[in-house]
Amino acid sequence: YEIGSGLVGSEMCIRDRIKPIMKDEAFLAIKSVPATKMDTQVAQDLKDTLQAYSDQCVGMAANMIGVSKNIIIFAIGPAQIVMYNPKITKKSRPYKVKEGCLSLEGERNTTRYENITVVYQDESFKKCKQSYSGFIAQIIQHEIDHCNGIII
């Protein structure tokens, strides 16, 4: 919060929850630990931070805001989807792609899969299983790599 910023009420609260982006590759290379119901504030911080960077970014993992928890978020249009403890259980149709990341400089080559199936817990910590394809699948793979300490 900056004095004289003109922000009031809830705008100040949201601005306070926007977290700086972690750029320390040694920290980003650490595998995240499982998330619990005690980590809902981390998910809220991810929502606020992703919204603040929506012109540059479509997904984030908790370690990108300095929290080593297994939580990711991604945007599908205006909707933000949070996944706790996501794991890819099935993948098919590999392809090569260059990706960028707010935490890293430039773009890097990586392999992604056109189709994936993910098991995860939703925001109510209900177990879910969902299949994704295309660009959304690519985003999810990138963010799960973050949780696993894999840097593109």
Tell where the protein language model's regions lie, with residue ranges:
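Positively charged, low-complexity/disordered segments
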Residues: 1-11
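Positively charged
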Residues: 10, 15-152
